[in-house]
Amino acid sequence: EYLTSNTKSLLDNGYADNSELSAKGKNVIVIGGGDTGTDCIGTSLRQGAKSITNFELMSQPPEVRSESNPWPEWPVIFRVDYGHEESNKVFGKDPRQYQLLTKSFIKDKDGHVSGIKTVNVELVDGKLNEIDGTEKTWDAELVLLSMGFLSPEHYLSEDANIDIDERGNYKAKHGE
């Protein structure tokens, strides 16, 4: 909704209707990455956010493709996209914080979000484990969710007895 409403307001009337959800003067947290997360970072920057932090659940990817990630798989490597680069120029640092799990949202007396509680996590044997003593509270007046998806919902596959692979996607034979 954030990106859509801002683009619509800009294109319809140059923000004259004040209908867009603005990051101006706010501590912004973007939960999740990818293209949508980068767009949320860039839009928040252009609106004059006070700060921007981007939470990533997984660890920072390696600089080069690992042997366990061969071609033709999508290369899982560290990338700096336009939003990260712009944020670095404005705030002097990359906005991404890795291996963070959001535990709860904090609200102010009026019921608006005012912060987030997190804990660091590590991936062990395919399972995310919380790291004791790493709890942290972050200021946030605007939280944007950009978590995407890893696999389809499974109620269809369960009802139709469709097998799923190790990533939770429907199993299929190539070419069928």
Locate predicted features.
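Rossmann-like dinucleotide-binding cores of NAD(P)H-dependent redox enzymes
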Residues: 41-100, 104
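Active-site proximal loops enriched in glycine and acidic residues that flank catalytic Cys/His/Asp
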Residues: 32-33, 56-59, 98-101, 106, ...
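Short, solvent-exposed amphipathic alpha-helical segments in soluble enzyme
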Residues: 44-47, 121, 160-162
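FAD-site-proximal beta/loop scaffold in flavoenzymes
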Residues: 1-25, 124-176
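N-terminal Rossmann-fold NAD(P) dinucleotide-binding loop
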Residues: 37-38
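A structured beta-alpha segment of the ubiquitous adenosine-cofactor-binding alpha/beta core
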Residues: 16-18, 85-95, 99-141
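Beta1/beta-strand and adjacent pyrophosphate-binding region of the FAD-binding site
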Residues: 23-34
